[in-house]
């Protein structure tokens, strides 16, 4: 038993593996029909009997040659090259190479990139960039300016003269003049009338124009009514009361004492004190030189003083310390 023995498997052989019984049978229906049409053994099928006369057989390929190649064709590589050259020559004669001497071929075929991008289904360029990328529509001077080629002075002068002449011709041909029967004043008067008619058509009637004034008056009345309501409201009254208390606290106990002295029945009234203070201020202001002239009284705040019967003014400010308020004790 060898080391490389194959695994056992069952294999069935037919009685006629090559099917020779069918091929050797002359009583087949197809063969009879072909014989009626003129075919016989040893002939090929087809109008010219060019078909295969033998059965198809499997051939073993044990070399590196191409399919169908034999040892007889190995030395015929020069003939293959000649056949290839003949094929190229036939193609050149059919399509016809362009000669270099012909003047028509010297002219370059120019095409518009913009038109090509419009015609083509696929987008070649964006529409706003096609004009900039298309150089076929540019002249030689434009291309020279782009690529920086120098030109002779004579050619430049000739080009300038030609361009000026062309510009003059185009300016003469393209000038357009318009004449109107209206003067400037009539034109502007007509325009103003049109604008007024538009504004009148767009603006509402006189009733609508009067409504804003009445609305403003009503708004002012509502504001005044709201102000009076705010003044009479309890919150506003409470705020005023707090403000009054704050002012009295800032004035201090001395001012309160002075008010109490003024309100005593034996003491002078506030009007007399104020009159006396005003007279004293006027005496101070007047000088002996200007007694005849009446000077303008200066506005000054005079301290309130008590005047005794003897004419001596006494300050009502107490020397003692301020009186403290008694706190209420809840029981």
Curated annotation (Swiss-Prot):
Stretch list, region Disordered: 1-28, 156-175, 197-331
Self-association and partners: Interacts with MCRS1, TERT, TERF1, NCL/nucleolin, and the telomerase RNA.
Record's protein name: PIN2/TERF1-interacting telomerase inhibitor 1
Biological process per Gene Ontology, one example term: negative regulation of telomere maintenance via telomerase
Keywords: Centromere, Chromosome, Kinetochore, Nucleus, Phosphoprotein, Telomere, Tumor suppressor
Similarity annotation: Belongs to the PINX1 family.
The keyword Nucleus is annotated on this UniProt entry: yes
Domain writeup: The TID (telomerase inhibiting domain) domain is sufficient to bind TERT and inhibits its activity. The TBM domain mediates interaction with TERF1.
InterPro entries reported for this sequence: G_patch_dom (IPR000467), PINX1 (IPR050656)
Keyword Nucleotide-binding annotated: no
Placement of sequence motif TBM: 291-301
GO cellular component: chromosome, telomeric region; kinetochore; nuclear chromosome; nucleolus; spindle
Sequence positions bearing Phosphoserine: 233, 269, 274, 277
Domain of life: Eukaryota
PROSITE patterns, per database record: G_PATCH (PS50174)
Regions of compositional bias (Basic residues) in chain numbering: 236-246, 297-306
An MF annotation (GO) of this entry: telomerase RNA binding
Region (Telomerase inhibitory domain (TID)): 254-328
Natural source organism: Rattus norvegicus
Subcellular location, record wording: Nucleus; Nucleus, Nucleolus; Chromosome, Telomere; Chromosome, Centromere, Kinetochore
């Amino acid at each position: 038993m060898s080391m490389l023995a194959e695994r056992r498997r069952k294999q069935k052989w037919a009685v006629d593996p090559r099917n020779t019984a069918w091929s050797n049978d002359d009583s087949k229906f197809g063969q009879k029909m072909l014989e009626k049409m003129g075919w016989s053994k040893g002939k090929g099928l087809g109008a010219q009997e060019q078909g295969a006369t033998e059965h198809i057989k499997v051939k073993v390929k044990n070399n590196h040659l191409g399919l169908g190649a034999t040892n007889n064709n190995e030395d015929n590589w020069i003939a293959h090259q000649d056949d290839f050259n003949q094929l190229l020559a036939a193609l050149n004669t059919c399509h016809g190479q362009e000669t270099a001497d012909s003047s028509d071929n010297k002219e370059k075929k120019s095409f518009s990139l913009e038109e090509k991008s419009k015609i083509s289904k696929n987008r070649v360029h964006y529409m706003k960039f096609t004009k900039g990328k298309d150089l076929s529509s540019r002249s030689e001077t434009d291309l020279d300016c782009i690529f920086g080629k120098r030109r002779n002075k004579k050619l430049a002068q000739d080009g300038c003269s030609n361009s000026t002449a062309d510009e003059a011709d185009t300016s003469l041909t393209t000038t357009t003049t318009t004449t109107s029967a209206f003067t400037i004043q009539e034109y502007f008067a007509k325009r103003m009338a049109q604008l007024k008619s538009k504004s009148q058509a767009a603006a509402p009637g006189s009733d609508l124009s009067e409504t804003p004034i009445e609305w403003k008056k009503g708004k002012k009345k509502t504001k005044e009514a709201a102000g009076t309501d705010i003044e009479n409201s309890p919150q506003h009254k409470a705020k005023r009361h707090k403000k009054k208390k704050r002012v009295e606290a800032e004035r201090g106990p001395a001012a309160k004492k002075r008010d109490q002295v003024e309100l005593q029945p034996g003491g002078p009234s506030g009007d007399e004190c104020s009159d006396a203070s005003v007279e004293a201020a006027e005496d101070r202001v007047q000088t002996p030189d200007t007694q005849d002239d009446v000077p303008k009284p200066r506005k000054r705040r005079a301290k309130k003083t008590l005047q005794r019967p003897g004419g001596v003014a006494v300050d009502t400010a107490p020397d003692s310390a301020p009186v403290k308020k008694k706190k209420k004790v809840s029981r």
